[in-house]
């Protein structure tokens, strides 16, 4: 009886007539929410265009109406902004919610798993394909295993449960072969009962989309393990996917920037080296920026930084992959064989929060994701020499951990990024450069890369310099 009422309420909040698959999902969700067992997790796997976001949005609005507690937990700040918008409900990053800072006598803070003081609350995690469970050596967070810590946090609260949603065709976390948070056996390993629902049918409203037509074909090829020849991309008959010759790139990018803004346009590349070439060209030939760093420059954080936000409430730390806009550039200087700048940044995904940082300029140009290890070590030992007069090692390390140069923020330009950096985000205009393809690149990883890149676009996908034999 109550099940039927809950199902009706969710359907009433649905923006359109549910598909048969969505009907099953609504029924399963209602049973999950009303189950007397608390040691149960709901896994909603859905491909692009199958309506999983609409379904969860309807669920959240229903819970709000019934005054039942829910917390939205995406993995990144940008994903939080997107999730909050479609669910009409505040969203927090996983790290912000499940970890708390621990300070040790002026040393750099660590983060331990928080106490879950909520009761009978549904925690909804979007973009769960991005959640890693690889133990990270030297991690500042809990056990270093995000999925372990998430499960521990949620189920330590009385009557609390977890709903994981994501897309198994997307790229798994770096260094992992699959996304553990969308793999039932991984969750059963915590002693949890797993309710699984898969959405595979593209909803009628999305069937005219060339982006989704091709994304659907790509994930079918992944499922069939047919990933060893160049996939054909269907462009004819679709308005949202275009082939772009290289000689039209600058004009088209410029038009997108003028029409939709820098923050709604992105270039996705195969490598950091290729992204660097794009970023250099875009800044010089489209934005006419002559200085290394200008007011208005769009940046992406290259590595987690805990130093500059230690005394800030708005951000616990500056996460790898977060975007920032340069508000002001003040002093630049060269020290230890590296270049630094005092910069005021604005973080658009955190209500335009403003922060003063010391920035390492060298990473803007490296072909690696962040400062290479050898360079990082060189910086460490160069700064350490400044404290050579301190004989007690522990005291020397304290000074290092409080040093603004050793803790300088590492960033890259954000006009062009790799696909892993783009994951979790959405843009109206996505320019996709897959680079020169050889047979050795034709693997399931490439197909997942392509699928993930395709599904970043909400408006138009531009295929830059695509070979004619790949287009139909």
Label every PLM stretch briefly.
Residues 2-16, 45:
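Conserved adenine-nucleotide phosphate-binding loops and their immediately adjacent elements
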Residues 4-6, 25, 29-30, 37, ...:
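Conserved helicase motor core of P-loop NTPases
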Residues 10-30:
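N-terminal pre-Walker A segment at the start of P-loop NTPase domains
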Residues 18, 72, 267:
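Conserved SAM-binding loop
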Residues 22, 76, 271, 424:
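Short, conserved phosphate/pyrophosphate- and ester-handling motifs at nucleotide-, phospho-/glycolipid
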Residues 26-27, 31, 36-229:
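ASCE P-loop NTPase helicase motor core
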Residues 39, 77, 331, 412, ...:
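Catalytic phosphate/metal-binding cores of nucleic-acid and nucleotide-processing enzymes, i.e., regions
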Residues 335-472:
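C-terminal accessory regions
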């Amino acid at each position: 009886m109550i099940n039927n009422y809950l199902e009706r309420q969710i359907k009433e909040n649905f923006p359109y007539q549910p598909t048969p698959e969505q009907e099953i999902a609504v029924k399963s969700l209602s049973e999950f929410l009303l189950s007397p067992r608390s040691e149960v997790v709901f896994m909603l796997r859905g491909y692009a265009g199958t309506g999983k976001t609409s379904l969860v949005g309807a669920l959240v609005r229903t819970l709000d109406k019934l005054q039942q507690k829910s917390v939205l937990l995406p993995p990144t700040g940008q994903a939080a902004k997107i999730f909050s918008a479609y669910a009409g409900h505040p969203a927090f990053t996983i790290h912000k919610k499940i970890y708390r800072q621990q300070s040790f006598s002026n040393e750099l803070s660590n983060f331990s798993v928080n106490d879950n003081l909520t009761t009978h609350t549904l925690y909804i995690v979007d973009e769960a394909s991005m959640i890693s469970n690889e133990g990270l050596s030297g991690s500042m967070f809990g056990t270093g295993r995000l999925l372990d810590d998430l499960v521990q946090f949620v189920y330590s609260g009385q009557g609390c449960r977890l709903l994981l949603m994501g897309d198994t065709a997307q790229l798994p976390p770096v260094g992992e072969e699959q996304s553990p948070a969308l793999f039932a056996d991984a969750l059963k390993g915590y002693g949890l009962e797993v309710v699984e629902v898969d959405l595979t049918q593209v909803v009628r409203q999305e069937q005219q989309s060339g982006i989704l037509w091709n994304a659907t074909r790509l994930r079918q090829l992944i499922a069939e393990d047919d990933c060893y020849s160049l996939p054909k991309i269907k462009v004819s008959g679709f308005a949202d996917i275009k082939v772009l010759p290289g000689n039209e790139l600058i004009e088209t990018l410029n038009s997108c920037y003028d029409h939709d803004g820098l923050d709604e346009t992105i270039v996705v590349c195969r490598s950091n080296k290729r992204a660097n070439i794009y970023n250099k060209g875009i800044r010089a030939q489209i934005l006419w920026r002559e200085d290394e760093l200008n007011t208005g420059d769009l940046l992406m954080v290259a590595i987690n930084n805990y130093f500059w936000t230690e005394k800030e409430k708005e951000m616990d730390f500056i996460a790898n992959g977060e975007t920032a806009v340069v508000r002001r550039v003040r002093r630049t200087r060269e020290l230890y064989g590296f270049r630094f700048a005092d910069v005021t940044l604005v973080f658009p995904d955190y209500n335009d929060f403003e922060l003063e940082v010391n920035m390492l300029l060298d990473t803007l140009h490296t072909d690696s994701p962040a400062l290479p290890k050898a360079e990082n070590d060189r910086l460490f030992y160069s700064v350490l020499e400044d404290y050579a007069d301190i004989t007690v090692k522990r005291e020397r390390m304290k000074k290092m951990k409080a040093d603004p140069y050793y803790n300088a923020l590492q960033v890259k330009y954000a006009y062009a990024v790799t696909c892993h950096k783009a994951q979790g985000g959405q843009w109206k205009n996505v320019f996709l450069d897959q680079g020169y393809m050889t047979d050795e690149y034709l693997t399931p990883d490439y197909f997942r890369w392509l699928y993930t890149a395709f599904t970043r676009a909400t408006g138009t996908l531009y295929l830059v310099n695509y070979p004619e034999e790949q287009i139909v």
